[in-house]
Amino acid sequence: MKQKPDLSFRKLWDLSFGFFGVQIAYALQSANIARIFATLGADPHSLSYFWILPPLMGILVQPIVGSCSDRTWTRFGRRIPYLFVGAAVAVLVMCLLPNAGSFGMAVSAAMVFGLVTLMFLDTSINMAMQPFKMLVGDMVNEKQKALAYSIQSFLCNAGSLVGYVFPFFFTALGIANTAPSGVVPDSVIWSFYIGAAILILCVIYTTARVKEWTPAEYAEYNGTNSSVEQEEAGKGDWLTLLRHAPATFWKVGLVQFFCWFAFMYMWTYTNGTVAANCWGVDTVSYTHLRAHETELHL
């Protein structure tokens, strides 16, 4: 088995640059979904129900993408086709989701539309996100992996910061941060539009700049035979892999499991909590108002 060559900083950057756009999309989703559904007419105290389907899809999509991409060999690479398709779907859904209240639908229909688009958005973001992590494992040697993941972490946090700031930035530019009842404000809509544009441009950049190894090159650098690898991959599934996972995997997984309790509460209820405690918005009265508007629309 040959040693994987050292990559220049530029090449390590190119491997993960698309992650910047993916994280902008993820930040826009996590920061604004509660606001969008509350605007559409959802009870602010029951917003967590809208978050049930997206994580379920993530449980399925992430291992499926990993398993399928392990067995995929195309002229475009093995990971890049998945991240490009995921990003393309995410861009489409990001243009639709904030407009759920602008299509003239009844409140119930708008919320169902929003729920379905949220499910596809979370699924497509997961599909676009995971291949970037796999590219580092495929193409970076052990000596440079710490640097590669540090670059990825920097781009991840930078993208999150940009995504969180976008609505404030566009409001400061004079784009309306308020809208008629049941309609998402333009500052949020344009945040999703610009985020979608940055996402696809970042992914196109990585797609154009990164050339994945051929099956022969992969086998040469990773000590595997591609035909044997494909044959072995077909003998098991991700459930089998879970049963044989090392103890460290389960320890880290347990910590992550409890961390995500806090993340979901934070993303779902922070907006309403800040509105009630910092700005004095009466969320109970707001709930009754939206319920009355829902009855009128129905």
Protein language model features and the residues they cover:
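Intracellular loop-helix junctions on the cytosolic face of multi-pass helical membrane proteins
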Residues: 1-10, 101, 105-116, 127-128, ...
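Conserved small/polar residues in nucleotide/adenosyl-binding loops
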Residues: 287-296
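Central cavity-lining transmembrane alpha-helices of secondary-active solute carriers
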Residues: 49-67
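C-terminal ends and interior cores of transmembrane alpha-helices
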Residues: 84-106
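Short helix-loop-helix connector
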Residues: 41-42, 69, 73, 139-141, ...
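Cytoplasmic membrane-interface "Motif A"-like loop-to-helix N-cap segments
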Residues: 71-86
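Helix-loop boundary and gating motifs at the non-cytosolic
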Residues: 2-55, 251, 264-280
